[in-house]
UniProtKB/Swiss-Prot annotation:
This is Polyadenylate-binding protein, cytoplasmic and nuclear. Residues 39-58, 376-429, 596-663, 740-762 are annotated as: Disordered. Keywords: Cytoplasm, mRNA processing, mRNA transport, Nucleus, Repeat, RNA-binding, Translation regulation, Transport. Residues 389-425, 753-762 have a biased composition (Basic and acidic residues). It is found in: Cytoplasm; Nucleus. Residues 48-58, 645-663 have a biased composition (Low complexity). PANTHER family: RNA BINDING PROTEIN. Gene3D superfamilies: 3.30.70.330, c-terminal domain of poly(a) binding protein. InterPro entries: Nucleotide-bd_a/b_plait_sf, PABP-dom, PABP_1234, PABP_HYD_C, PABP_RRM1, RBD_domain_sf, RRM2_I_PABPs, RRM_dom. Residues 664-741 form the PABC domain. The gene is PAB1. Belongs to the polyadenylate-binding protein type-1 family. One of its GO terms (cellular component) is nucleus. Residues 600-612 have a biased composition (Gly residues).
């Protein structure tokens, strides 16, 4: 809408704001209830929110939708935004590894008029209980980060939300973005931002609203200062401080005595002793403000550590809360890094321990490799019958004592153990959790222990011995492993289906400008991704090409480049009709395929990769399957890779000529790649997986991974001997069940995610 330009309108608004109550009127919302159900109910637009006109440099039909609940999907947004007009594409931006929503999306309309209408009628609409924030998408990061026309407002009442703030400031000019800062619980932090299209509008808003009352609170309105500029000013203030903080003050000291102590160093503008509100007693600290920095600095130098009324004072520059928190964070991080480096390479994590192994037995097992500083077997905490009357402090102390080594697993810290535990303490030990820690004095001894003790049988159980790692390191490794396996499965599925090489492109396309994240437009059927030198079809000005996941700058996330047909390898030859990726129903189906690919692990039905049937793709004739695929191509498991494809024979071939799992065919394949042990391992896995799947289908993938740690010659023998294979499968199941039980006990403080449970290697 056009901004009022006449002075009378602005003056009238100013007078209205003088005693405005932001809760006085009925709050206008568009109650769609999209998150609860897809009823297609008509949107209530009785009181549309004033919005800005489209940016002047170019017409745009692309909208940025922020403040979304993590569970909001493309289908939910399509249900809402399609009521305004024809939607070209919708993309919810997600994390590249976890595929979790980042809380914002992009909606592309076919016409700019529909985009303007959506911005006018749907801004601050409740989606799954949270008001969304809509603005025009700005692809140029330089324009987003200039800060021109950006206004900062503080001392806002907690009842003022995004819409109320927008309504208040919309009269001064076109608003590009409006936001009230919120905490993790959705409560207002008391400040917000309004981004105008022009500096003139921002100046008008500051002139007329700064110092006015909103909900009986006087607000401050000023130009937004970038963080780097604020930091430089803050550093200057720190160097020229006048306010000092004093602590360790005797409670008997009066205000006059406190002020007199500092007045001899210069002119004091104010002094204050902190007192308890109920009793009025001094809390032992206070503040003194001088007129000049030199006087304040002199007082700090001469009074710090000086005795006053029998107590040594602490006198220093007064710090803001965020400064103190930052210093504490840095000191904690430094201590943690020092602790981690101290035990780097010497602390071992041992699991799959027998219940009979105690601390002493664990020490004896590893003592042959060098001096041991500590050895600890983790155990459950127990409560003796006669301990019910113990104090709460005692119970918490015992709990902390038992949990301390468990935290060590995540923090790579040294297990604590007192030497020479008495018999009474031993009698109170709980059941072993099946894992423990051994800390050596020398890294070389620890390395030798890992090499010698890993997989050694102790009480008929193979030990797992490795260097202890912090929790965040293990999590990063697991995420990288999951991503690599999912990519490998997609490539294997494409190869098994006979997909030509030119159709198996990387998921991110780099355009002529070498800028990552640009996706090619939806081409004709059978058209592969453009290669170097091929021009991309220009899109509508201001609108993202279909399948391009735009990234709003400065949000701390990597570019989200997902091809239009993510979950399917490349684009397919023209062997039948195929749905266009712009179709929102197709986007919803592709999202299901993505989730199936990420949720499926080495075992379980979901682990069969994105090519598995069961997820219907809209637009396919009769759900018959993917064009150009053999009828059974989508039903193959993870083993259906290159080796399985090589083992298939034409339909008319004799039965004996088929089956990649036959020993003769297997030996031939192994001989062909004799110089590549990794490829041999892959062939053996493809051959052994169907046999294991017939024995135990639910954990076939996980058991296959466990058995692949064996030597290749042993694996060949297992392929040829079903009895030996079944025996090994039973052993692997026993080890896995024991591992699951130990993990449930040892890491119960934080249950692993579904991906971790499925993908973690036993």
């Amino acid at each position: 809408m056009a901004a009022p330009s006449n002075t009378a309108a602005v003056d009238q608004l100013t007078s209205d704001l003088a005693n405005a109550n932001m809760n006085g009127g009925e709050k206008t919302t568009v109650n769609t209830n999209v998150g609860a159900s897809f009823t297609g109910e008509e949107i209530d637009t009785a009181g549309p929110t004033p919005s800005s006109a489209a940016p002047h440099p170019q017409a745009s039909a692309s909208l940025y939708v922020g403040e979304l609940d993590p569970s909001v999907t493309e289908a939910m947004l399509f249900e809402l935004f399609s009521q305004i007009g024809s939607v070209a594409s919708i993309r919810v931006c997600r994390d590249a590894v976890t595929r979790r929503s980042l809380g914002y999306a992009y909606v592309n309309y076919n016409t700019t008029a529909d985009g303007e209408k959506a911005l006018e009628e749907l801004n601050y609409t409740l989606i799954k209980g949270r008001p969304c924030r809509i603005m025009w998408s700005q692809r140029d990061p330089a324009l987003r980060k200039t800060g021109q026309g950006n206004v900062f407002i503080k001392n806002l009442d907690v009842a003022i939300d995004n819409k109320a703030l927008h309504d208040t400031f919309a009269a001064f000019g076109n608003i590009l973005s409006c936001k009230v800062a919120q905490d993790e619980n959705g409560n207002s932090k008391g400040y917000g931002f309004v981004h105008y299209e022009t500096d003139e509008a921002a100046s008008q808003a500051i002139k007329h609203v700064n110092g006015m009352l909103l909900n009986e609170k006087k607000v401050y309105v000023g130009h937004h200062i970038p963080k780097k500029d604020r930091q430089s000013k803050f550093d200057e203030m720190k160097a020229n401080f006048t306010n000092i903080y004093v602590k360790n003050i005797n409670p008997e000291v009066t205000d006059d005595e406190f002020r007199t102590l500092f007045e001899k160093y210069g002119d004091v503008t104010s002094s204050s002793l902190a007192r308890d509100q109920e009793t009025g007693k001094s809390r032992g600290f206070g503040f003194v403000n001088f007129t000049s920095h030199e006087d304040a600095s002199k007082a700090v130098q001469e009074l710090n550590e000086k005795e006053f009324h029998g107590q040594n004072l602490y006198v220093g520059r007064a710090q803001k809360k965020h400064e103190r928190e930052e210093e504490l964070r840095k000191s904690y991080e430094a201590a943690r890094q020092e602790k981690a480096s101290k035990y780097q390479g010497v602390n071992l994590y041992i699991k799959n321990l027998d219940d009979e192994v105690d601390d002493e037995k664990l020490r004896q097992l590893f003592s042959e490799f060098g001096p041991i500083t500590s050895a600890k077997v983790m155990r459950d905490s127990i409560t003796e019958p006669g301990e019910e009357g113990e104090s709460k402090e005692g119970e918490e102390s015992e709990k902390n004592k038992e949990n301390k080594p468990e935290e060590k697993e995540g923090d790579d810290s040294k297990p604590e153990e007192k030497e020479g535990e008495d018999s009474k303490s031993k009698s109170k030990l709980g059941k072993s959790k099946g894992f423990g820690f051994v800390c050596f004095a020398n890294p070389d001894d620890a390395t030798k222990a890992v090499a010698e003790m890993n997989q050694r049988m102790v009480n008929n159980k193979p030990l797992y011995v490795a260097l202890a790692q912090r929790k965040d390191v293990r999590k990063n490794q697991l995420e990288q492993s999951i991503q690599a396996r999912n990519q490998l499965r997609m490539q294997q599925a494409a190869a098994a289906a006979g997909m030509p090489q030119q159709y198996m492109q990387a998921p991110v396309f780099y355009g002529p400008g070498s800028q990552p994240g640009f996706m090619p437009p939806a081409g004709g059927r059978g058209m592969p991704y453009p290669q170097g030198g091929m021009p991309m079809q220009p899109g509508r000005p201001g609108q993202f090409p279909a399948g391009f996941a735009a990234q709003q700058g400065g949000r701390g996330a990597m570019p989200q480049g997902i091809p239009p047909m993510y979950g399917l390898p490349g684009q397919f030859p023209p062997q039948g009709p195929f749905p266009q990726p712009n179709n929102p129903q197709f986007l919803a189906a592709m999202q299901q395929i993505q989730q199936s690919a990420l949720a499926g692990g080495r075992g379980g039905p979901a682990g069969r990769g994105p090519m598995q049937g069961g997820v219907p793709v809209p637009g396919m004739p009769g759900g018959a399957g993917l064009p150009g695929f053999p009828p059974n191509a989508r039903q193959q498991g993870p083993g259906a890779g290159r080796g399985a494809a090589a083992g298939r024979a034409p339909a008319g071939a004799p039965a004996g000529a088929r089956g990649a799992g036959a020993p003769e065919g297997l030996q031939g394949q192994l001989a062909a790649v004799a110089d590549n042990p990794g490829q041999q391992k892959q062939i053996l896995g493809e051959a052994i997986f169907p046999k294991i799947q017939a024995i135990h289908p639910e954990l076939a993938g996980k058991i296959t991974g466990m058995l692949l740690e064996m030597d290749n010659t042993e694996l060949v023998a297992l392929v040829e001997n079903d009895g030996a294979l079944r025996s090994k499968v039973d052993e692997a199941l026993a080890v896995y069940d024991d591992y699951v039980r130990q993990q449930g006990d040892g890491e119960g403080a934080q249950a692993p995610s579904k991906e971790e449970k499925t993908e973690e290697k036993a």
